[in-house]
A protein has these predicted regions:
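Glycine-rich helix-loop "coupling/hinge" segments at transmembrane-helix boundaries
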Residues: 32-38, 215-242, 277
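Short glycine/proline-centered loop/turn elements that form peptide/ligand docking sites
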Residues: 169-173, 272
């Protein structure tokens, strides 16, 4: 254990040093035409109160909630099948489909969704050929497209966490419910689902945090029409070279993420008692 302390301490120091540098930049004034920041100021944080930036924060939080919710809706059946399926081939297929995206970069996965959601992409081509639509649907550069692609990004970790929780549930609980007259659906709703709440909480909070920090997916799929905090930080830092304001936006985003995750954990704490002990 002591052998691992030094590397962990070095990593922690690296993260703290980077955070301190960003904090220091966020409290400095922007000097137009210069990459060097000016003196101490709180103007960067007061500027975040403007409706434009407040709207970006609200949109980002809403997209994070949507992504976490739909990732849970898609991931739970996959995790359940992965744990309880008796067919080895089916288990292997689910595992490969779920885990493979982890071996691909976010940019690669995002470009694959451009191929799927574009005006000449797979979805529109199938709908046009089937006669269901007469002209391509606008799926790119929309919130729907961004959330869809982000669900694909966060799905593997959701399935892994849910599968870990489901695998620790003793099947005797379900058998006991069945022996008392509960059908499969009622047994799932009254036994399996409550006992898997620790995995649900872990998966949802992780998906929320990953989505909040996502950059490539909203940048490429959103195309500048769906603004999130990470994209705005990029625009301010590398297009306007306003690094102090970009740093203040990063700090505010980090604080908001911790606040929302803290509220989610506090709201879900009463449910954790249903988990397996």
């Amino acid at each position: 254990m002591r052998v691992l302390v030094s590397p962990a301490a070095l990593c922690a120091l690296g993260f703290l040093a980077a955070l301190a540098a960003v904090m220091q930049y966020s409290l400095r004034a922007y000097v137009p035409g210069s990459l060097e920041p000016g003196g101490f100021t709180l103007a960067n944080f007061t500027a975040l109160m403007k409706p434009l930036y407040a709207r970006v924060f609200l949109d980002t939080v809403w997209i994070c909630f949507l992504t976490a919710f739909f990732t849970l809706v898609v991931g739970y059946p996959l995790a359940y099948a992965l744990v309880h399926a008796r067919n080895v081939a089916l288990k292997s297929t689910i595992l490969v489909i779920t885990v493979t995206p982890l071996f691909l970069g976010e940019v690669v996965r995002t470009y694959s969704w451009i191929v799927v959601l574009g005006n000449n992409g797979f979805v529109n081509s199938m709908l046009l050929k089937s006669g269901l639509i007469e002209q391509p649907l606008q799926l790119m550069f929309t919130r729907f497209g961004v959330v869809t692609a982000l669900v694909h990004v966060t799905l593997p970790v959701m399935v892994i966490m849910l599968a870990a929780a489901l695998s620790h549930i003793d099947r005797d609980y379900e058998r006991a419910a069945a022996s008392l007259g509960a059908g499969p659906i009622r047994a799932f709703l009254t036994v399996t689902l409550p006992l898997s709440t620790p995995g649900i909480i872990a998966g949802v909070t992780t998906a929320f945090a990953w989505t909040f920090s996502a950059f490539a997916t909203p940048q490429l799929i959103g195309g500048g029409r769906v603004n999130m905090v990470s994209n705005l930080v990029y625009q301010l830092g590398f297009a306007s070279f306003n690094f102090p304001f970009a740093a203040s936006l990063s700090v505010a985003g980090l604080a908001l993420t911790f606040a929302v995750l803290g509220l989610m954990r506090a709201a879900a704490r009463p449910l954790e008692r249903f988990g397996p002990h």
